Regions:
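SAM cofactor-binding core of SAM-dependent methyltransferases
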Residues: 50-107
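A short SAM/SAH-binding and catalytic strip from SAM-dependent methyltransferases
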Residues: 119-137
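S-adenosyl-L-methionine
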Residues: 1-50, 60-67
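A short acidic, Gly/Pro-enriched loop at the edge of an enzyme's catalytic core
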Residues: 111-119
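Conserved beta-strand signature within the Rossmann-like core of class I S-adenosyl-L-methionine
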Residues: 154-161
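A short glycine-rich, Lys/Arg-flanked "PGG" loop and its adjoining helix->strand segment in the class I
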Residues: 139-153
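A structural alpha-helix within SAM-dependent methyltransferase catalytic domains
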Residues: 63-66, 144, 148, 171
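Class I S-adenosyl-L-methionine
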Residues: 170-172, 177-214
Length: 214
């Protein structure tokens, strides 16, 4: 496959730890619902269908996910507004199968048991388009090595983005890591519609989906 004309010419498979950009969007009205720590015994859910949602933004990807029996969603997000929105949703509906973690996923991933997740969703992550900010992109060999240990054998990782440079660079990283060429998917699978996707569609941007196993 020929590189897309907007794809960066040079892509690095970073092996160092990604740099976490600590920029929480905190508002006073959310101050009572954020930064709470809920300690749960994750091992008792090992036999469930566990979904890891990384960077759920304002929460649409979690709130709009179709509920099925024996399914548990674990959402990781750094921004307080999205965390507060999902916590309000959980508390209002008295939902018990959604767990929220605020902070850096590169650190939080260490807290999960090995062989735990069936699915990983990474929908419309921050592309960090400026070259000097590429070190903040978390899909690197460093993170993939960690993530792989947390996945069950028949796992599925789903990445979606409308940012051409980001998705082609990510595809390059994955091709190197997996030592094979993965292709873009022609279908969205069970990906819920989010605010970011609606925004991309309004701009008539192409949405790319990468679906693979680690």
């Amino acid at each position: 496959m020929q590189p897309h004309p907007l794809q960066s010419r040079e892509v690095f498979l970073m092996t160092n730890k990604p740099v976490f950009f600590n920029r929480y969007r905190i508002r006073k009205k959310h101050s009572n619902t954020i930064n709470k720590h809920y300690y749960i015994d994750l091992s008792k859910y090992a036999d469930s269908t566990n979904i890891l949602d990384i960077g759920f933004g304002d929460g649409d990807s979690i709130i709009n996910t179709k509920r099925v029996d024996n399914q548990r969603i674990h959402g990781v997000e750094s921004y307080s507004i999205g965390v507060s929105k999902v916590l309000d949703f959980i508390n209002t509906r008295k939902i018990t199968n959604i767990h929220i973690y605020q902070g850096d996923v590169v650190e939080i991933i260490d807290s999960f048991p090995c062989n735990y997740f069936n699915y990983v969703n990474i929908f419309f992550p921050d592309p960090w388009p400026k070259r000097r900010h590429h070190k903040r992109r978390f899909i690197t060999k460093f993170f993939l090595d960690k993530l792989k240990t947390k996945l069950k054998k028949n796992n599925q990782v789903h990445i979606a983005s409308d940012h051409i440079n980001y998705i082609f660079d990510t595809k390059h990283v994955l091709n190197n890591y997996l030592d094979k060429c993965i292709q873009f998917s022609n279908h969205r699978s069970n990906r819920p519609i989010t605010k970011y996707e609606k925004k991309a569609m309004s701009k008539r941007n192409i949405i790319f989906d990468l679906i693979f196993s680690l």
